[in-house]
Amino acid sequence: DEADVAALRNALFHDGKIDSGLVGKDAPVIVEAAGLSVPEGTEVIAIKINAIGKEEIMCKEIMGPVVVVKSYDTFENAVQMACDNMNEAGGVGHTAGIFSNDDAHVRYAAERIPVARLLVNQPTPDAWGPTTNSLSPAVSEGCGSWGNNILSANVDWYHLVNVSTVAMKLDCEPSDGEKLFK
């Protein structure tokens, strides 16, 4: 109900930012912080929302077992909502997920959602690159120029190694800019 959603919203976010004390906590801890209760053994909290983007803070990254659910009319509408939400609430360049066995839907989403990783039929926390997908195991996930990062790949150990390159002068004529850029 809307009162429960409001309580969770107020527990999870303060002044527009996630409550760092609830990041990574189990569902019962989050629910208790909101002054609510759930049956014993609850692992995931699903919240139905009516708005996206700037209008709904629950659309921001929560980093906990909270799933935000929003209805849509058509698949194309859902993809547009995902794009709008990322542009307004944050996450551009990071990761999106789609659960579909329709290759046309996967392609449609991949061509439109501005992310470095689109995970298909798997949870988005798997963007770090476990052995269950083809992504490189990451210490961090680059968001590319979409997210003001230099990389749009998973940041791996080799990105953290300093490399010195020795460049010797070539014994050749300089390139002719006129010919090169015609």
Give short role names for the model-derived ranges.
Residues 1-28, 57-61:
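Flexible, acidic loop-helix segments that line cofactor/substrate-binding pockets
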Residues 31:
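Substrate-access "cap/lid" subdomains that shape
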Residues 36-182:
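Conserved C-terminal structural/oligomerization subdomain of aldehyde/semialdehyde dehydrogenase
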